[in-house]
Amino acid sequence: MLDKKVLEILVCPLTGGKLSYDTERAELISHEAGLAYPVRDGIPIMLVDEARKLQPEEPKEGSELQSSDNQ
């Protein structure tokens, strides 16, 4: 689980936009960039080279994702 305070502070390094946390996959999602940044051992890996590209069929913002807006 990622601390809510950390989620409030972090932004996408590519776009500067907000991130959502996918608890099932342990990833920080940037819908604007279409990327998912991994969270390993509770540490967000905020490197574009480490991010996975989102697939079109993946959940959109607000569906089963925790974001800094959901407080």
Swiss-Prot record:
Basic and acidic residues bias spans: 52-63
SUPFAM superfamilies linked: Trm112p-like
One GO term describing the cellular component: cytosol
Region (Disordered): 52-71
Pfam families: Trm112p
InterPro entries given in the database record: Trm112-like
Family designation: Belongs to the UPF0434 family.
PANTHER family, per database record: PROTEIN PREY, MITOCHONDRIAL, ZGC:162634
Protein name in UniProt: UPF0434 protein APH_0052
Organism for this UniProt entry: Anaplasma phagocytophilum (strain HZ)
